[in-house]
Amino acid sequence: MKLLFIGDIVGSPGRKALAELLPGLQAQHGLDVVVANGENSAGGNGITPDTAAEIYAAGVDVITCGDHLWDQKEVEILLDEEPRFVRPVNYPAGTPGQGSTVIERAGQPTVGVINAQGNTFMRGELDNPFRSVKEESVSYTHLRAHETVRN
């Protein structure tokens, strides 16, 4: 299985580069899953449903975010309606959205994506990212935990 993780997609130039380059990378490398950080895709300040749509259209399967999540009010739509949009799992209980998602495709291993935000030099009250990821991963142990993927 081939996975690609992309760091910050920043503004219009980042979205344009993604749209131009990702299809070729997918074809050249046979990528199975693409995860990208989109929290700065709206002019370097947050993400909107429109910028998320561009990122998904370019071939990204899951969008993660971090401390710039709340920079655009429209993000609430993504948190409420888009299962492929993953906020940090270690945000306080009751925060809208989800901290993880699962990608299931016929003939491929199931892939779980958990997003956590570090808490060093960060504002706000974040739970311990290591503890949060460990707790979240327990809910996924039933997903082909007995299989080992080698590629």
Residue ranges and their predicted role:
Residues 1-3, 100-113:
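Beta-strand-turn-beta hairpins that frame and shape the catalytic cleft
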Residues 6, 16-97:
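Core catalytic region of metal-dependent phosphoesterases/phosphodiesterases
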Residues 8, 63, 114, 150:
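Divalent metal-coordination and catalytic microenvironments
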Residues 9, 115-127:
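Flexible, glycine/proline-enriched loop segments at strand-loop-helix junctions
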Residues 12-13, 41-45, 120-123:
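Short, small-residue-enriched loops and turns at beta-alpha junctions
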Residues 91-92, 108, 117-121:
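Short acidic/polar capping segments at secondary-structure boundaries
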Residues 128-140:
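Active-site glycine-rich loop that binds ribose-phosphate moieties when present
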Residues 142-151:
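Single conserved hydrophobic/aromatic residue that forms the stacking wall/gate
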